[in-house]
């Protein structure tokens, strides 16, 4: 998927340059830890920021929560370098409470989607009852180990009255995009943030969960308490929250939260 155009690149570079001149005096290495929900748009936008500012952005990827080796809280506990943290909003709040982060800027809203292997039959998911039937009929179901998966496994299955039915067929997928598992044929149905599903080839996204089952997740950015380049980090956050980033964010399947760039 193409996230940029010549016009967008010019606007983005100009916006990033203005932000940088306002926020920092010299080029720096900016260490970022980011979870999967915003990563596709982020990966498309970072080169524009680097061109405009001369900064080098070094990125580590991992879930917003949990204890896996790549999880952002685990990385911070290991003392890995971090200037900017981009993850689920309430997970960032937890890091602020623990003294690991110092701020929060809400960037996007993200909805959960449903996917099947490319070319496979597309079950009806238009209503809660339809989703229930699709899940019960599926031989295997996959969900993530981050925010969407926590909701699906602890709330949505219970709401549908299928927790017992899902016990053996539904699997939490750690440290791997759910869409990759679906594309390989290892799960018949996959559920994760739409932006994460869109980033993987080999799947068909049926659509978002119906509103009665939907769980909108806010992805936010903050400065790490141990940051060595807080001003450069703030400039990056301002750029990601600016109008220049909007087209790329929307194309990745996310909804920008307006008015957060400061």
Where are these regions (language model features)?
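Bacterial N-terminal signal peptides that target proteins for export
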Residues: 1-13
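Bacterial N-terminal signal peptides
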Residues: 11-22
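Phosphate-/polyanion-interacting regions in eukaryotic proteins
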Residues: 86
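Sec/Tat signal peptide C-region and signal peptidase I cleavage site
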Residues: 23-27
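Terminal low-complexity, poorly structured segments
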Residues: 4, 15-17, 34
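Exported/periplasmic ABC-transporter solute-binding proteins
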Residues: 28-70, 74-81, 89-97, 102-110, ...
């Amino acid at each position: 998927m193409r996230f940029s155009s010549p016009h967008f690149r010019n606007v983005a570079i100009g916006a990033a340059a203005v932000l940088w001149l306002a926020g920092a005096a010299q080029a720096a290495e900016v260490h970022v830890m980011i979870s999967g929900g915003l990563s596709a748009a982020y990966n498309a936008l970072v080169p524009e920021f680097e061109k405009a500012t001369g900064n080098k952005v070094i990125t580590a990827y991992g879930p917003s929560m949990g204890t896996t080796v790549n999880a952002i809280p685990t990385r911070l506990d290991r003392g890995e370098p971090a200037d900017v943290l981009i993850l689920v909003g309430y997970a960032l709040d937890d890091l602020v409470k623990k003294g690991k982060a110092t701020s929060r800027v809400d960037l996007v809203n993200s909805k959960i989607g449903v996917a099947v292997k490319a070319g496979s039959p597309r079950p009806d998911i238009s209503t809660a009852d339809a989703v229930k039937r699709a899940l019960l009929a599926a031989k295997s179901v996959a969900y993530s180990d981050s925010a969407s998966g926590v909701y699906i496994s602890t709330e949505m299955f219970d709401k549908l009255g299928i927790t017992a039915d899902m016990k053996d067929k539904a699997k939490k997928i750690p440290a791997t995009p759910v869409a990759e598992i679906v594309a390989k044929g290892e799960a018949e149905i996959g559920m994760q943030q739409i932006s994460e599903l869109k980033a993987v080839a080999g799947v068909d996204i049926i659509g978002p969960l119906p509103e009665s089952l939907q769980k909108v997740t806010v992805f936010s950015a903050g400065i790490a308490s141990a940051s060595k380049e807080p001003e450069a980090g703030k400039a990056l956050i301002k750029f990601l929250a600016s109008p220049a980033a909007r087209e790329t964010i929307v194309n990745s399947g996310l909804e920008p939260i307006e008015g957060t760039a400061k």
